[in-house]
From Swiss-Prot:
Belongs to the YqgF nuclease family. The keyword Lipid biosynthesis does not apply. One of its GO terms (biological process) is rRNA 5'-end processing. The lineage of its organism: Bacteria, Bacillati, Cyanobacteriota, Cyanophyceae, Oscillatoriophycideae. It comes from Microcystis aeruginosa (strain NIES-843 / IAM M-2473). This is Putative pre-16S rRNA nuclease. InterPro entries: RNaseH-like_sf, YqgF, YqgF/RNaseH-like_dom, YqgF/RNaseH-like_dom_sf. One of its GO terms (molecular function) is nuclease activity. One of its GO terms (cellular component) is cytosol. Keywords: Cytoplasm, Hydrolase, Nuclease, Ribosome biogenesis. It comes from the Bacteria.
Length: 145
């Protein structure tokens, strides 16, 4: 079985939630939240994670509108994700992330780990949900012969 080295990203205006997965590609886990300042200042933080985890692909959540269209926010996410993929020299895939932040918040509340002050926890959990969806889809595609 090939090793999976993917990084899940929940890209927002102020923060980027980051998630990684185990080498088997079964379980995604929130890793950290990067506070965005400038793109140039953000890059070294991503480079360190990519190097440490030997990342081979980026998976970014794309916030489609409820009508399934690419709105302004989705276009901004695409712009940032594409620049990031180029800067890190990694391939990039997208996952529909409608409602992942809400799902992440509900999950953290259920675990009694929710704090309205810790927005970074929601971003990390949303990134884990995004990456888990990608891992699950990848597994389904690879098992269908």
């Amino acid at each position: 079985m090939e090793r999976v080295a993917a990084l899940g990203l929940d890209i927002g205006k102020k923060r980027v939630g980051v998630a990684g997965c185990d080498g088997t590609g079964l379980i995604a886990t929130g890793l950290t939240t990067i506070i965005r300042s400038s793109f140039v200042a953000d890059i070294p933080q991503f480079e360190a994670i990519v190097k440490e985890r030997n990342i081979k692909i980026l998976v970014a959540g794309l916030p489609y509108t409820m009508a399934g269209e690419l709105g302004f926010q989705a276009q901004q996410v695409q712009k940032y994700a594409q620049k990031l993929a180029i800067a890190l020299d990694l391939p990039l895939e997208y996952i529909d992330e409608r409602c992942t932040s809400l799902e992440a918040e509900e999950f953290l509340k259920a675990k009694k780990q929710f704090s309205s002050w810790d927005k970074g926890a929601i971003d990390r959990e949303a990134a884990a949900i995004i990456l888990q969806q990608w891992l699950d889809r990848r597994r389904r595609v690879n098992t269908v012969v």
